[in-house]
Regions:
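Conserved ABC ATPase signature
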Residues: 136-140, 144
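Conserved catalytic motifs of ABC-family nucleotide-binding domains
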Residues: 89-98, 109-110
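ABC ATPase NBD coupling module
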Residues: 69-83
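The feature captures the beta-strand-to-loop junction immediately N-terminal to the Walker
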Residues: 38-40
Length: 225
């Protein structure tokens, strides 16, 4: 099966500190893959995921998308298809609805349109009623903010999710809401895939079929559930 995303000797180094953050890494993500990466804090999990998302430039190596290197002109399209979600996503001032509409004001997405029906269905998966759309973002709990950020991403119909400890700061109920949203998104289309970075081994095993481990910038594992 061909890879959606592939890395070839992808590496990152902090030149100021003369520290290796990510050893040269070969990795392939295929359609229908559910991959988890666990490891200690500072082991390089987030460094790898951010490089995969093209948020931080690698020191060396390549990220391939559909077998091809990614040109600068293709990065906005890549980021709309390969979506990164951080542990503490930023929301804009205004209501939940304002936040969900916001991506469609961006130049790269202006040809696409906000769909209330899609958002309402996603809210239901997270146990939220349509009234939730009127809440002010400043009044949301950490769990509610993460749900909004995830729905904001899922409505774009991404091919791949890159999830950087999305439930690390959440209570168990909010974590279940996030997991339910991702389960529903994945089940809706068998060609989708995700990489989930987690400090929680039980969650990693529950939410993935392929388990990888990061230690001192070295990615290893590839065990099937």
């Amino acid at each position: 099966m061909s890879a959606l995303i592939e890395t070839r000797a992808l590496a990152r180094r902090d030149e100021r500190r003369q520290a290796v953050l990510l050893q040269p890494t070969d990795f392939a993500l295929h359609r229908a893959d559910r991959v988890s990466i666990t490891g200690a804090s500072g082991s390089g999990k987030s460094v790898f995921l951010r490089a995969l998302a093209l948020l931080d430039a690698p020191t060396s190596g390549q990220v391939l998308w559909n077998h091809r290197p990614i040109a600068n002109a293709d990065i906005p399209e890549y980021r709309s298809r390969i979506c990164y979600l951080s542990q503490r996503p930023a929301l804009i001032d205004g209501t939940v609805l304002d936040n969900l509409r916001f991506p469609f004001s961006l130049k790269s997405l202006r040809k696409r349109h906000f769909e209330l029906a899609t958002v309402t269905a996603l809210l239901q998966h997270a146990g939220k009623s349509p009234d939730f759309l009127a809440k002010n973002a400043s009044d949301l709990s950490g769990g509610e903010s993460q749900v909004v950020a995830l729905i904001r991403t899922l409505q774009l119909n991404p091919e791949v999710l890159l999830l950087d400890e999305p439930t690390a700061a959440l209570d168990p109920a909010s974590s279940r809401d996030v997991e339910a949203l991702i389960d529903a998104w994945f089940a809706d289309d068998p060609t989708r895939a995700y990489v989930w970075v987690s400090h929680d081994l039980e969650q990693a095993q529950r939410m993935s079929d392929i388990h990888l481990h990061m230690s001192a910038g070295v990615l290893s594992g590839a065990t099937q559930a």
